[in-house]
From Swiss-Prot:
Signal peptide: none annotated. This is Kappa-casein. One of its GO terms (cellular component) is extracellular space. The modification Phosphothreonine is found at T98. Keywords: Glycoprotein, Milk protein, Phosphoprotein, Secreted. Belongs to the kappa-casein family. The modification Phosphoserine is found at S102, S119. It comes from Cervus elaphus. One of its GO terms (biological process) is protein stabilization.
Length: 122
């Protein structure tokens, strides 16, 4: 871990290397054997595969801040449940067959009476 102290940075950064290898481990060219079967080989040279040079990656990590210094405001995230009264309108249908006091047979349809009733549901 390296410490970077720069005049342009407000506070020092600790640098954590992402990939560190010694130069002996980093090979730019790697020799690969030829994979053709022996009966087809006629003094073919070995194939060379070019592997890109991996760049070293660094991550700049700011130092940990003291959590005791900053006051975290407590916010009440629990909302109080208030009951909302929602009026509902229901239609009540009364079917009344009116019969007159006579000896005649009434073949009319029964009268339909509709009343509006408003109730509050909580």
């Amino acid at each position: 871990v390296a410490l970077i102290n720069n005049q342009f940075l407000p506070y020092p950064y600790y640098v954590k290397p992402g990939a560190v290898r010694s130069p002996a481990q980093i090979l730019q060219w790697q020799v690969l054997p030829n994979t053709v079967p022996a009966k087809f080989c006629q003094a073919q040279p070995t194939t060379m595969a070019r592997h890109p040079h991996p760049r070293l990656s660094f991550m700049a990590i700011p130092p940990k801040k003291n959590q005791d210094k900053t006051d975290i405001p407590s916010i009440n995230t629990i909302a109080t449940a208030e009951s909302t009264i929602t009026p509902t309108t229901e239609a009540i249908v009364d079917t009344v067959a009116t019969q007159e006091a006579s000896s005649e047979v009434i073949e009319s349809a029964p009268e339909a009476k509709t009343d509006q009733v408003t109730s509050t549901v909580v």
